[in-house]
Amino acid sequence: MVQEIAKKLIRMGKNEEAQDLYFIPRKEEYQVFMRVGDERRFVQSFPFEDMTAIISHFKFVAGMNVGEKRRSQLGSCDYPLENGVVSIRLSTVGDYRGYESLVIRLLHDEERELRFWFDQLPELKKKLAGRGLYLFAGPVGSGKTTLMHALAQERFADQQVMSIEDPVEIKQDNMLQLQLNDQIGMTYDNLIKLSLRHRPDLLIIGEIRDKETARAVVRASLTGVTVFSTIHAKSVRGVYERLLELGVSEEELKIVLQGICYQRLIAGGGVVDFATENYQEHSASRWNQQMDLLAQSGYIQLAQAQAEKIIYN
């Protein structure tokens, strides 16, 4: 019964293309939610006893310590379903009562439709004019990794491509994909140094998380390699400011930074490009124009367009 419920929840998340499943302990029960775009949807309630068994099942298949219920843990696995597997990442932490919360990130590696205000992916490919650093920014689950891999397939299909990720989210047969493992010294910094010895035409670095990663990404870009990476920021200008906070100098940014693509998921609207202009000249008006176009085309409701415009003004 436990496995049947677990499979049902993962299958539902996959079918709905949810980014995350949340298992949250409340006062008298557990509640399960899923996130699709910016919307968090209630799924179902479970008794404590049932959900404790379900969480233990997920922890076991992900190689986590089933007996540890208070300290935070991370895990990942390919979860088997009837028609294949779903790659998932897990994060747990216990509350003050000893009940665990669980978040499952579903890694969708299938090809997704990307709708842009310009003429689709080939047009964006033309903007990859020179070697250096290209950054993809936006909220969690907005499709940054999907876009990076789509561009890699479109622009570097017959070239040497390597990726460094934590974990590998989209499996590609035509690139060498490396996965972080701090326990055996496979850190971002060490793997970037190793990757440069392979002389890749494109190096995909999953995420700029801290000063160490930021410095390593800049060093890789300075060698003349084309580098793709993601970063969390609230705007294109916010990307620039975030890099400065992480210790990257303005002079280094002027040398290596070739472009920034900001994106976020709009309910009903697909993945929409925010800006491909020079990061120092970006204006939020471009985003507002796109919101108007999406509403006029019927992809999103007018109220949603107005709400998104308010966010970015």
Predicted regions and their residues:
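Short, flexible helix-loop junctions that flank or precede catalytic/ligand sites
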Residues: M1-N313
